[in-house]
């Protein structure tokens, strides 16, 4: 992989991680389409570090408020009285499903989708998931009431959205897409759904990055990959921050229809490409 490819993949990761169109699907499809080399462990760590930096930089004030309220609730023995404290508990509970699923299934999914084990079949599955979850998001847009605010978030909501987040281990589902979809079904307004999706994603992104980092510590970072590492971190962080800002503002006025159309169109195009490639 060269620096240009690293920058492109970093931009793709940063943009698609926070838009409901599946970052993992794009990171699988791009190297497959253009016959690029496998990014490798070190670069995967760079991408996770970049997107984690983006979401922490954007929501640092929210995180401080949530942390203060959470600890204050524990001290007063009223952990669910304050909405910010409830949000903190919802993030904790909502992070458990993805954590457990990742612990038990990550290696199997990684081998099939990311390490070439699934071949063209993995692309077909990814394409189908892009399409299916696009239709599910359309159903959420159509039937969700969209009146609830983030202050009304409860622990049950956190668990339901967390279960949806666990599905995003499968490329094509989209972590932000699945969590925003679940939140819309629960009646949350679009901006609130996106905001909770991003905050809930912090432990998931950090956990995935930590697992990859532990593996990298064992192997070490080769000197020739250091420039690629920095390029991946920087490009993913900058575009990730911009993607968060864009989507939160976009959803104040518009629906997710453009992303639904994109998901379905991309899935269909990929199915056609695979069919002709065989």
From Swiss-Prot:
Q: Name one GO molecular function term.
A: undecaprenyl-diphosphatase activity
Query: Where do transmembrane segments lie in this chain?
Result: 14-34, 40-60, 89-109, 121-141, 153-173, 196-216, 227-247, 257-277
Q: What Pfam families has UniProt attached to this entry?
A: BacA (PF02673)
Superkingdom: Bacteria
* Keyword entries, A-Z: Antibiotic resistance, Cell membrane, Cell shape, Cell wall biogenesis/degradation, Hydrolase, Membrane, Peptidoglycan synthesis, Transmembrane, Transmembrane helix
**Main localization category:** membrane
Please state where this protein is localized: Cell membrane
InterPro entries linked: UppP
Q: EC annotation?
A: 3.6.1.27
Signal peptide range in chain numbering: none
Q: Provide the membrane topology annotation.
A: Multi-pass membrane protein
Q: Per the record, what are the reactions this protein catalyses? A: di-trans,octa-cis-undecaprenyl diphosphate + H2O = di-trans,octa-cis-undecaprenyl phosphate + phosphate + H(+)
Q: What class of enzyme is it?
A: hydrolase
Gene Ontology biological-process entries:
cell wall organization; peptidoglycan biosynthetic process; regulation of cell shape; response to antibiotic
Answer yes or no on keyword Cell wall biogenesis/degradation: yes
| Gene Ontology CC, one term | plasma membrane
Q: Does the keyword Lyase apply?
A: no
> Which NCBIfam families does the entry link to?
undec_PP_bacA
Q: What does this protein do?
A: Catalyzes the dephosphorylation of undecaprenyl diphosphate (UPP). Confers resistance to bacitracin.
Misc remark:
Bacitracin is thought to be involved in the inhibition of peptidoglycan synthesis by sequestering undecaprenyl diphosphate, thereby reducing the pool of lipid carrier available.
Q: Which family is annotated?
A: Belongs to the UppP family.
Give the protein name, as stated in the record: Undecaprenyl-diphosphatase
């Amino acid at each position: 992989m060269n620096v240009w490819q690293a920058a492109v993949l970093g931009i793709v990761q940063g943009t698609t991680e926070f838009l409901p169109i599946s970052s993992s699907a794009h990171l699988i499809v791009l190297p497959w389409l253009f016959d690029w080399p496998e990014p490798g462990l070190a670069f995967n760590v760079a991408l996770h570090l970049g997107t984690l930096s983006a979401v922490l930089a954007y929501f640092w004030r929210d995180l401080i408020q949530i942390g203060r309220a959470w600890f204050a609730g524990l001290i007063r023995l009223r952990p669910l009285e304050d909405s910010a404290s409830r949000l903190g508990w919802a993030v904790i509970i909502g992070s458990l499903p993805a954590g457990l699923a990742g612990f038990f299934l990550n290696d199997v999914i990684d081998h099939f989708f990311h390490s070439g084990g699934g071949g063209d079949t993995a692309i077909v599955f990814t394409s189908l998931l892009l399409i299916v979850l696009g239709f599910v998001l359309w159903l959420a847009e159509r039937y969700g009431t969209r009146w609830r605010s983030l202050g009304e978030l409860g622990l049950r909501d956190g668990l339901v959205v967390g279960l949806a987040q666990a599905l995003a281990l499968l490329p094509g589902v989209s972590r932000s897409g699945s969590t925003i979809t679940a939140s819309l079904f629960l009646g949350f307004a679009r901006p609130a759904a996106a905001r909770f999706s991003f905050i809930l994603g912090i432990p998931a992104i950090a956990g995935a990055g930590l697992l990859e980092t532990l593996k990298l510590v064992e192997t070490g970072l080769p000197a020739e990959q250091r420039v690629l590492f920095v390029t991946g971190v920087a490009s993913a962080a900058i575009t990730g921050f911009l993607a968060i800002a864009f989507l939160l503002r976009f959803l104040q006025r518009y629906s997710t229809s453009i992303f639904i159309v994109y998901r379905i169109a991309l899935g269909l195009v990929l199915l056609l490409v695979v069919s002709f490639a065989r």
